Curated annotation (Swiss-Prot):
One of its GO terms (cellular component) is cytosol. Belongs to the UPF0301 (AlgH) family. It comes from Buchnera aphidicola subsp. Baizongia pistaciae (strain Bp). InterPro entries: AlgH-like. Pfam families: DUF179 (PF02622). HAMAP family: UPF0301. NCBIfam families: PRK00228.1-1. This is UPF0301 protein bbp_491.
């Protein structure tokens, strides 16, 4: 039986050396017998904001909109790095929305950007370019090799925690207060 990690965080173990995944937190959008898909939520793209994306797409922002459009766009992963993925808590259905949980959806269509730009007070938006994928059983093998820790996702960490604190706060959420005590060695009883 496969454990389903959809709507969970993957938290990189401290020993992970790959610069993209080092100290990363990945929100898992999909996980089934065919593989898995997730979005890194704590690696920002330098000098790219939601405002710049909207400007490039010629989408005007309503003047009364209170969203901080200077929020950074996130590096979602190494696959399809030119494609946008928006995690959000809107109940509205967009052209390409997928509900991941009762509270959270992911959308890849332009209509969500137009919707966000015209709201008065949009909240709970994380925009990423790219995503991560794992082929069949690859994620389970990586977890067994102690590359990732897992925990149910926390919306507060996704949307309200500063980017630089998401990895540490995710570790704290599973009771790991002293990260230096972790080892990537696998124990055997």
């Amino acid at each position: 039986m496969i454990i389903n990690f959809k709507n969970h965080f993957l938290i990189a173990m401290p020993g992970l050396k790959d610069p993209l995944f080092k100290n990363s937190v990945i929100y898992m959008c999909k996980h089934d017998n065919n593989g898995a898909m997730g979005i890194i939520i704590n690696k920002k793209i330098k000098n790219l904001t939601i405002q710049k994306i909207l400007h490039q797409l010629k989408i005007n922002i309503k003047s009364s909109n209170t969203l901080d459009f200077k929020n950074p766009v996130i590096i979602g992963g190494p696959i399809l790095e030119d494609r946008g993925f928006i995690l959000h808590t809107f109940k509205k259905k967009f052209t390409t929305s997928t509900h991941i949980s009762n509270d959270l959806s992911i959308t890849t269509s332009r209509d969500i950007l137009e919707y966000i730009a015209n709201l008065n007070n949009p909240k709970n938006i994380l925009m990423a370019l790219g995503h991560c994928i794992w082929k069949q059983h690859q994620l389970e093998q990586e977890i067994a090799k102690n590359i990732w820790l897992t925990t149910p996702a926390d919306i507060d960490i996704i949307f309200n925690t500063p980017i630089s604190e998401k990895w540490k706060k995710s570790m704290y959420s599973i009771g790991i207060m002293n990260i230096l005590q972790l080892t990537s060695e696998i124990g055997h009883a």
